[in-house]
């Protein structure tokens, strides 16, 4: 369904004895935004996805076909219980969407922005907490600073908005070449090339747990406005790879890589260890999906959607540069 301009819609439609929330999800066609759109649609919400219609649309949703930077009046005829902004990476992304929503009438009740743990400078003591100052992180560069500016732009115009800062997201629909890279190695029986001793720590968060956090915010409207979200426990690279191999029914064998200038050439994470303090998250959810369980879900999706993964040249680099070492 493509939305056209028309009479201004009412928020919270009464249907079959209950109110159905109207949710606007930016994106909706790839990994996180698609999972979120489908998650809330399955819950019975009326989910509207805002994108340019270049990819298949998520199930049980309504399409608003538009570029968020050139919205015209298409959203000014709509009202939503919540805007779930999954695809804002810059201040302009936020400002253009808010301009498109309009200010003449209150067009939404809640606004939830998915930001990132990349907003914390690497020089701060870890784990990073929401009360620490944000700033440039040398590892994340413009990605992190742009997310900071997006947060600032939002709070300037919508002081009661909510911001979630996750670490590495994973789960079904993940087309980013992370767990899928390890699954590729496992399925092909490759020795895994491990950065140094493999003790670098990684922090993950299942995309369904992210949805649960959003759901809690919309239901309870907590007083805090910024939440770090993520699994409480970090795992080493080695532990994570072993879990991925075991999920694929294999046992990992390792080669240790030393002296390569950039591990990004052959591995799916930067040489950077960070951890978020997720104590405040307990106000939203009290448990998270165990990593082993989440990876099983991710592997099942991967097995049926290998062609949807955006692969990088890690295996080619390993074959050409590392196997002969």
Name every feature range the model reports, one short phrase each.
Residues 23-42:
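N-terminal Rossmann NAD(P)H-binding glycine-rich loop of SDR-like oxidoreductase domains
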Residues 98-146, 156, 162:
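Conserved Rossmann-fold NAD(P)-dependent oxidoreductase catalytic core, especially the SDR/UDP-sugar
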Residues 151-173:
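Conserved beta-loop-beta element that borders a ligand/cofactor-binding pocket
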Residues 173, 201-208, 227-247, 289, ...:
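Substrate-binding strand-loop-helix patch
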Residues 183-192, 200-235:
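Alpha-helical substrate-binding/gating segment
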Residues 216-267, 272-273, 312-325:
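Mid/C-terminal beta-alpha module of Rossmann-like enzyme folds, strongest
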Residues 261-287, 293, 304-308:
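Conserved C-terminal active-site "lid" loop/helix of NAD(P)H-dependent oxidoreductases
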Residues 291-325:
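Amphipathic terminal alpha-helices
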């Amino acid at each position: 369904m493509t939305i056209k301009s028309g009479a201004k819609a009412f928020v919270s439609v009464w249907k079959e004895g209950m109110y159905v929330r109207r949710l606007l999800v930016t994106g909706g066609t790839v990994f996180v935004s698609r999972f979120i759109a489908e998650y809330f649609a399955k819950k019975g919400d009326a989910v509207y996805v805002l994108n340019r219609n270049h990819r298949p649309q998520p199930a049980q949703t309504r399409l608003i076909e538009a570029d968020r930077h050139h919205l015209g009046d298409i959203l000014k005829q709509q009202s939503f219980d919540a805007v779930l902004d999954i695809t804002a990476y810059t201040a302009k992304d936020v400002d253009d969407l808010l301009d498109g929503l309009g200010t003449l009438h209150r067009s939404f009740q809640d606004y939830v922005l998915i930001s990132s743990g990349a907003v914390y400078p690497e020089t701060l003591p870890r784990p990073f907490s929401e009360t620490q100052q944000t700033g440039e992180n040398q590892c994340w560069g413009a990605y992190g600073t742009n997310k900071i500016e997006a947060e600032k732009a939002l709070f300037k115009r919508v002081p009661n908005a909510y911001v979630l800062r996750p670490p590495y997201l994973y789960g079904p629909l993940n087309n980013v070449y992370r767990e899928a890279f390890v699954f590729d190695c496992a399925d092909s029986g490759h020795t895994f090339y491990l950065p140094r001793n493999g003790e670098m720590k990684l922090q993950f968060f299942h995309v369904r747990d992210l949805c649960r956090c959003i759901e809690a915010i919309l239901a309870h409207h907590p007083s805090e406005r910024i939440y770090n979200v993520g699994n409480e426990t970090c795992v080493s690279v080695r532990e994570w790879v072993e879990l991925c191999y075991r999920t694929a029914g294999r046992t990992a064998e390792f080669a240790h890589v030393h002296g390569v200038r950039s591990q990004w050439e052959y591995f799916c994470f930067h040489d950077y260890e960070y951890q978020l303090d997720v104590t405040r998250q307990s106000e939203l959810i009290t448990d998270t999906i165990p990593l082993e369980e989440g990876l099983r879900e991710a592997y099942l999706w991967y097995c049926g959607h290998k062609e949807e993964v955006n692969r990088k040249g890690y295996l080619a680099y390993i074959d050409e540069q590392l196997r002969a070492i």
